[in-house]
């Protein structure tokens, strides 16, 4: 049975996330999927007449109440396997999965697998850490959907940000080779012009047959990667004077596509969005399009990619004819920076130790508070568990497996003490599922859900669960923001940086109890949804820079460091987590910060335990 793709179809027009997904499906010409357009319960089987669907795809409609249980707890788009126990949710995750499956179905189509970019990492990182994922998955679709509802002559900031990015220097693997080829092409063209001024045809580089006198070497290089067999190998080396040319003498590369030189999923995401925006902008203020010369040039180049015009015609997209002569970045764009980028520049180079900040807090009566462990001697009999349930089954040394068992003992002692039959327990940032698998095995009357953004980790967890024959466990590959289902307990072992705060916020919103082990304090920083300090009392005492000092030094707890520095690091950990605990208490939670037993189980041995009052 094929996988099922669920797309939102609420409203008079298709949401951009849905349009993007359908555009990719048309580009890949996928035939092995069952595609559902999800309608509100009251409008089941009543798709808006304004919606034009792709002509090369078969689609069905379904109402929300009939969705599979796992899909009901996720934001769309979402893909669910035939078993109904493994779901992928969120635009970036779903698009990457569609691309993988399409290439498996047609291995000869190099243009499909090249969408994933260098090392197959395009849109792999979550929006919290990747500017491109954030721009494609959140910023651009959200801004343009708002613009479409109320078009005006004001260009959204997010679109200007994309224009700015198209003017940034190209960063591409092995660019030295391509720049030398460009130098040789330029020198060859100059020689030909000198020999025969009447000739308009320059010699074609043997590496890129597709290049013409109207096509840049960069675009030719990009398009050659999208042919069935990919780019041809160079038959000969460059001449000596080309090989010996200094790097500083090589010509720069043109910014061809969104992320640089090659056509990727990023372009697939942005094309339907930018097209819809340009159509709307042209209707209200056509002259404003001239303020986006780089986007206009990109918009034309994308249309030259094999398969794009076919997908566009299938999706009822009629491209606009936009002038983009001498596309250069506008002067105003050189000074454009998002608030986030400005904040990062402002605070990235601060200096100073933690003592002044700690002293300041102490004078205000704020010191790290560690509650006693509720079950310090509680431990699972790991020897009695099936091998697949033990961390030793994962890819780690025996010494590390023992420490992992000790860490699990701490979290599991809390969860098993409060869990009741019928509870839903979510293992956030689950990785290979060490916490969730043991919980599912020990608590068969509870439903366990693993949520993890890394597909490889989740697939390993799925294999282990198959060995154990567990039927009370579900898997969701997604950023945790895309999980919207109800649950009673949330757990996270070593949630990295701001992920701890995201998990806590998710639990508080669901009024669920939580047991979280924070990690990577040095990666904590303000995000679109989360700002620091977290609690009112810490906000009154510290500014962002002072809080970041605590976070940086909270990471200095490694065993090889001097004891005094480790102790300071532990106190900084305690203060950062105290701020988190007080923030939760402001939302009517009872919260404790506890040290794991034994303390040697991890340098990051804090545990934040909370329950709604």
From Swiss-Prot:
Organism taxonomic ancestry: Eukaryota, Metazoa, Chordata, Craniata, Vertebrata
Keywords, in A-Z order: Cytoplasm
Location in the cell: Cytoplasm
Domain GST C-terminal: 116-312
Protein family: Belongs to the GSTCD family.
Species per Swiss-Prot/TrEMBL record: Xenopus laevis (African clawed frog)
GO CC list: cytoplasm
Protein name, entry field: Glutathione S-transferase C-terminal domain-containing protein
UniProt key word Cytoplasm: yes
Cross-referenced PANTHER family: GLUTATHIONE S-TRANSFERASE C-TERMINAL DOMAIN-CONTAINING PROTEIN, PTHR13369
Record-linked Gene3D superfamilies: Vaccinia Virus protein VP39
